[in-house]
Amino acid sequence: MTPYTWAMISRRWAVGAAAALLVGCGPTQGQPPVSTPSPSASPSPTPTPSPSPSPTATPVPDDQLPLDFPVADSLLDSAPAVVEELHRVAAGLPVLKVDITAQQATLTALLPDKSVRSYAWRDGLITHVDSDIQYLGQATFDPADYPISSVNRMFAVADLRGVRGELVLQVVEYREGQVLMTVTSRPETSTVFFRKDGTAVTTLGYTSVADITAGLEEVVGDGTALYGIGFNPTRGYWADLTDDEPGVVLSRSRVGGVPVFETRRSETPAVATFSPDLLQPAAIAQAIARYQATPDQSCDVTVDMSHGRFAPVARYDCAGTVRFTDMAGRDMTDLVGSG
């Protein structure tokens, strides 16, 4: 699934999503690119600032193209230099998208008049190519901020994870304001997401201590007060947190092999908040193992203060059987009830 398919899905999840990237097959030149401690605070993706195009920035004129730019090694080994030159040809303007395959690199920039312009490198030549990308307010970025030099390693990771066909590294807005790197393929098989530091996003399970710890850490991020947190195989890991703005709930989700994403909604929950330091992933994992009918059975876990006690309570719904524990994993179903 391409980043654009995920973008459509995410916009059904997110409230108030306002940006979209309409990309077909991308620019064409030759072959077109396709498009048990408690969790500690860790940074989560934040919207990427979009630099404004300089009103005086002018790309290299078409009459000076094609431009010779030979490289001594393969494109993948020379990707940083090639992308840097493509960006120079584009006058250093804010970038909407970068595609890199083994044979071609393409960069699409945002012009001061809000139109877009694409340049491609192939076989030692840089040319202006047509693009079907439209600017609808999506985030722009500077390619120098992303580890283009790691493209070989990212391709190797994608291959190990079963991405088959011609591999394509894309740097592009994935959700509103969030620019991510992905490796997908042509023909499309699957997609591997990479963080800005070049590390691959793993698919987390919902029963082991390691996976539960990682999932809770990612959705807590730098948060200090939770309205609720939980996970299940359908929704993934999620957390509702306080926001800097009063009357707003910050929601974070981490589903499958997709990075954490954030949404905000206007709400003042009646439930009290609690500290993420109270969470004990090992105790949650042990409770799941105790309540599962079979080792492969999934449970829907929710932790919040909705039961009116002095500390948060964990609720486990395993195939319709509901149990409750405190944060140490002690069963308290008889104290809380069966709701």
What is each PLM-predicted segment?
Residues P33-H128, L204-W238, G339:
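Extracytoplasmic low-complexity, Pro/Thr/Ser/Ala/Gly-rich segments
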Residues K97-L111, S115-Y206:
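Long, acidic/polar, low-complexity amphipathic helices and coiled-coil-like
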Residues M181-A225, G257-F261, R265-P269, Q286, ...:
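Extracellularly exposed regions in secreted/surface proteins, prominently low-complexity, repeat-rich
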Residues G26-Q29:
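Bacterial signal peptide processing site
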